[in-house]
């Protein structure tokens, strides 16, 4: 390392000064930083990193100027790197509070300002803040009222012995629209949207008033519950009757109303039951016929792989069989044109499963 420094910097006079002349510096060691920051005579080329011949001499590509941080904020502006000075003078130290060493300001005595928000955006935000306080206060007040009413509704419902489903059915009796148990539950838990809570609150408020004043509301609710709980029973047809209907369907898939009435009278069924059975049977026949037609078309067209299985050996070298699938080294493919007899690669059938093979 010392030899390298000696070959580069030892006995090297600064540019522009003679080493042997009177008053010149004596040959000896020169500090590289002093030599690099040396400024030549006025009018002469200055030596420094990134200035004039400096980058070409040292073979260093010019790099972007460093950023100067003022108060923790970076600004973008024309800057000059450290050690870059204007021609015609030496570097001079600058007092604190001004720009850094070698940094040119974009205005006389004014430091660059950091990027700030545009005044228009600030004005819009202020206008929004001036308009929103009243609306936000109203919304908060409504939210508090909804919370209190939800608690009151739950207490009143439990006290009077109503379930959430009963409340929904009673609303249907009073206002013609039945609400589900889930809706009432979500209202009490404040899980509905603010808009839906506001829409549902007047109806529930009337329900609370009716529950307090109307003594027959409980009976009305029970009657409505029975009506809603009564469901249409699933029709069950005996096998003997189903067989007779199947025979009649084969004779006439689409009977008229008179024929349906006659069939229902003979079999002891209701007209609607017979009509629905024939309708369902026709739909079932359409589905089965379409599936059968598709299968026939596929068989008529033939499989795209009509040729027999053809086995091709893998590339030479160690192979590892797939665990659980035996040890064949042949990949079975299907060719549309089978190989004629006597040619290479006859089909090979694998009947046994072997353990995985490993090469040594």
From Swiss-Prot:
Q: Which residues carry this modification: Phosphoserine?
A: 111, 236, 289-290, 355
Q: Which terms does the record give in the GO molecular function aspect?
A: DNA-binding transcription factor activity, RNA polymerase II-specific; RNA polymerase II cis-regulatory region sequence-specific DNA binding
Where is the stretch described as Disordered? 1-51, 88-114
What SMART domains does the database record attribute to this sequence?
A: HOX (SM00389), POU (SM00352)
Kindly provide the PTM information from the record. Sumoylation enhances the protein stability, DNA binding and transactivation activity. Sumoylation is required for enhanced YES1 expression. Ubiquitinated; undergoes 'Lys-63'-linked polyubiquitination by WWP2 leading to proteasomal degradation.
Q: Any idea what job this protein has?
A: Transcription factor that binds to the octamer motif (5'-ATTTGCAT-3'). Forms a trimeric complex with SOX2 or SOX15 on DNA and controls the expression of a number of genes involved in embryonic development such as YES1, FGF4, UTF1 and ZFP206. Critical for early embryogenesis and for embryonic stem cell pluripotency.
Subunit details: Interacts with PKM. Interacts with WWP2. Interacts with UBE2I and ZSCAN10. Interacts with PCGF1. Interacts with ESRRB; recruits ESRRB near the POU5F1-SOX2 element in the NANOG proximal promoter; the interaction is DNA independent. Interacts with ZNF322. Interacts with MAPK8 and MAPK9; the interaction allows MAPK8 and MAPK9 to phosphorylate POU5F1 on Ser-355. Interacts (when phosphorylated on Ser-355) with FBXW8. Interacts with FBXW4. Interacts with SOX2 and SOX15; binds synergistically with either SOX2 or SOX15 to DNA. Interacts with DDX56.
UniProt protein name: POU domain, class 5, transcription factor 1
Q: What lineage is this protein's organism placed in?
A: Eukaryota, Metazoa, Chordata, Craniata, Vertebrata
């Amino acid at each position: 390392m010392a030899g390298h420094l000696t070959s580069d910097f030892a006995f090297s006079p600064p540019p522009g000064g003679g080493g042997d002349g009177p008053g010149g510096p004596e040959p000896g060691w020169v500090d590289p930083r002093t030599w690099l920051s040396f400024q030549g005579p006025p009018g002469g080329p200055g030596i420094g990193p990134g200035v004039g011949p400096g980058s070409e001499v040292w073979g260093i590509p010019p790099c972007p100027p460093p950023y100067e941080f003022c108060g923790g904020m970076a600004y973008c502006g024309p800057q000059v790197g450290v050690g870059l000075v204007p021609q015609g003078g030496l570097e001079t130290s600058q007092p604190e509070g001004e720009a850094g060493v070698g940094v040119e300001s974009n205005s006389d005595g004014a430091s660059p300002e950091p990027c700030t928000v545009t005044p228009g955006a600030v004005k819009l935000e202020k206008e929004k803040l001036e308009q929103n306080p009243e609306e936000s206060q109203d919304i908060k007040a409504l939210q508090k009222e909804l919370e209190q009413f939800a608690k009151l509704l739950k207490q009143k419902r439990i006290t009077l012995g109503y379930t959430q489903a009963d409340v929904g059915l009673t609303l249907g009796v009073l206002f013609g629209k039945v609400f589900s148990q889930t809706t009432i539950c979500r209202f009490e838990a404040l899980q509905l949207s603010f808009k839906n809570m506001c829409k549902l609150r007047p109806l529930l408020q009337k329900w609370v008033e009716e529950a307090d004043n109307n003594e027959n509301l409980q009976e009305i609710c029970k009657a409505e519950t029975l009506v809603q709980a009564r469901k249409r029973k699933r029709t069950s047809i005996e096998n003997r009757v189903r067989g007779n209907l199947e025979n009649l369907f084969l004779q006439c898939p689409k009977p008229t109303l008179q024929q349906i009435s006659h069939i229902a009278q003979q079999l002891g069924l209701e007209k609607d039951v017979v009509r629905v059975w024939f309708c369902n049977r026709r739909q079932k026949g359409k589905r089965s016929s379409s599936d059968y037609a598709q299968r026939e078309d596929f068989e008529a067209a033939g499989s795209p792989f009509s040729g027999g299985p053809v086995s091709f050996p893998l590339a030479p070298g160690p192979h590892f069989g797939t665990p659980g699938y035996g040890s064949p080294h042949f990949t079975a493919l299907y060719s549309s044109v089978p190989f004629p007899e006597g040619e290479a690669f006859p089909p090979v059938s694998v009947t046994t499963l072997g353990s995985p093979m490993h090469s040594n």
